[in-house]
UniProtKB/Swiss-Prot annotation:
<keyword id="KW-0963">Cytoplasm</keyword>
<dbReference type="InterPro" id="IPR038157">
    <property type="entry name" value="FeoA_core_dom"/>
</dbReference>
<comment type="subunit">
    <text>Monomer.</text>
</comment>
<keyword id="KW-0410">Iron transport</keyword>
<dbReference type="Pfam" id="PF04023">
    <property type="entry name" value="FeoA"/>
</dbReference>
<keyword id="KW-0406">Ion transport</keyword>
<dbReference type="GO" id="GO:0006974">
    <property type="term" value="P:DNA damage response"/>
</dbReference>
<comment type="function">
    <text>Involved in Fe(2+) ion uptake. Does not stimulate the GTPase activity of the N-terminus of FeoB (residues 1-276).</text>
</comment>
<protein>
    <recommendedName>
        <fullName>Fe(2+) transport protein A</fullName>
    </recommendedName>
</protein>
<dbReference type="GO" id="GO:0046914">
    <property type="term" value="F:transition metal ion binding"/>
</dbReference>
<dbReference type="InterPro" id="IPR007167">
    <property type="entry name" value="Fe-transptr_FeoA-like"/>
</dbReference>
<dbReference type="GO" id="GO:0006826">
    <property type="term" value="P:iron ion transport"/>
</dbReference>
<dbReference type="GO" id="GO:0005737">
    <property type="term" value="C:cytoplasm"/>
</dbReference>
<keyword id="KW-0408">Iron</keyword>
<keyword id="KW-0813">Transport</keyword>
<dbReference type="InterPro" id="IPR052713">
    <property type="entry name" value="FeoA"/>
</dbReference>
<comment type="similarity">
    <text>Belongs to the FeoA family.</text>
</comment>
């Protein structure tokens, strides 16, 4: 998945490899299936990635974002 600044993504679900504890943490931060997030900034080497949901602003590693099933949303 190529995350670039000023792109929007919709969460469709979670990967089967995600641990229940980490899944619960993401859910508590508002990363719910059906919700969307915007990519704010990408670090110079591509990792980590700054995203914003309706509730919070997060900085996640690529490997953590890979645990989310997402689809691009047209702005």
């Amino acid at each position: 998945m190529q995350y670039t600044p000023d792109t929007a993504w919709k969460i469709t679900g979670f990967s089967r490899e995600i641990s229940p504890a980490y899944r619960q943490k993401l859910l508590s931060l508002g990363m719910l299936p059906g919700s969307s997030f915007n990519v704010v900034r990408v670090a110079p080497l591509g990792d980590p990635i700054h995203i914003e949901t309706r509730r919070v602003s997060l900085v996640l590693r690529k490997k953590d974002l890979a645990l989310l099933e997402v689809e691009a949303v047209s702005c």
